[in-house]
């Protein structure tokens, strides 16, 4: 379902504006946000957007491409949990992954650099390596 992103007839003060004489244009329409959630498998959806292009939306995520800045190598690793989301504290509680989210992976903590709802993939940069516990 589309979401109207045009101007409504309310002023910031709460008063009403005069009704505009234009009809609603198709290019004023939008969509609801994707809210990529942590899951045990990846789920991607291909949607057609304006101009006949396609976007890949990541609905559910289990893996991330994590780059280690020390060795400059990338690995596909499992996401263990969502630690913190600076964009919205409620997102971390609901396991929603957006750009800037700090995630716990098999390698350690990483910050998400891609937009999963737009790109269809989670790319992240390692910020804190996981400490190896000695056996015994």
UniProtKB/Swiss-Prot annotation:
A Pfam family: Ribosomal_S8e
Gene Ontology CC terms, in alphabetical order: ribonucleoprotein complex; ribosome
Gene3D superfamilies: 2.40.10.310
Any GO BP annotation: translation
The keyword Ribosomal protein is annotated on this UniProt entry: yes
GO molecular function, one term: structural constituent of ribosome
Family: Belongs to the eukaryotic ribosomal protein eS8 family.
Subunit field text: Part of the 30S ribosomal subunit.
UniProt protein name: Small ribosomal subunit protein eS8
Name of the gene encoding the protein in the UniProt record: rps8e
